[in-house]
Amino acid sequence: GGSRLANLNYYAEDLLNPYQPKQVVIYCGENDVVHTDKPSAKEVLSRFKQFFNTVRTKYPNANISYVSIKYSPSREEYWPIMKKVNLKIKSFLKTKKNTDFIDITKVMNDENGKVRKDIFLEDMLHMKPEGYQLWTKVMYPYLK
């Protein structure tokens, strides 16, 4: 737990070398935002771009899919920067071929647009199985 984009970049070769992926799905960035170094949205984007470029260089035809940062109730104070990071990564991916931005935030909201707390464990950070079932419905169409 607690993985950050810096970890993906550090371990990129170990993570990627054993495979010849047709698709790389990335869910990372939430822990970057809340880490003690408190990076800006621009810095988190920079870290993402570094990993993106590593994947793209090694596997030029692989589809790269990014799963948006979720808005955990326990991290509500960070939602504004998380929203900025999501927008920056989404905008970046729009300029690249063979990419997807998978927005899982909307499916986690109730009918009033508020984050559903009932899909989270007591810590209000990690999800219950119901939360992951919602993600599955959103993500499945993107899987290659």
Features from the language model and the residues they span:
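Membrane-targeting and insertion segments and their boundary/processing signals
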Residues: 22, 29, 37-38, 60-63, ...
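Sec-exported extracytoplasmic/periplasmic mature domains
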Residues: 13, 17, 29, 53-60, ...
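Charged, glycine-enriched surface loops/patches
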Residues: 43-67, 88-99
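A short small-residue
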Residues: 28-33, 68-70, 116-119
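Structural recognition of the beta-strand scaffold that forms the well-ordered cores
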Residues: 23-28, 63-68, 100-103, 126
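Catalytic His-Asp segment of secreted/periplasmic serine-dependent ester chemistry enzymes
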Residues: 71-144
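Conserved SGNH/GDSL esterase-like catalytic core that processes O-acyl groups on lipids
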Residues: 1-50, 73-87
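Short, surface-exposed, polar/charged, turn-prone segments marking secondary-structure boundaries
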Residues: 1, 23-26, 52-55, 91-95, ...
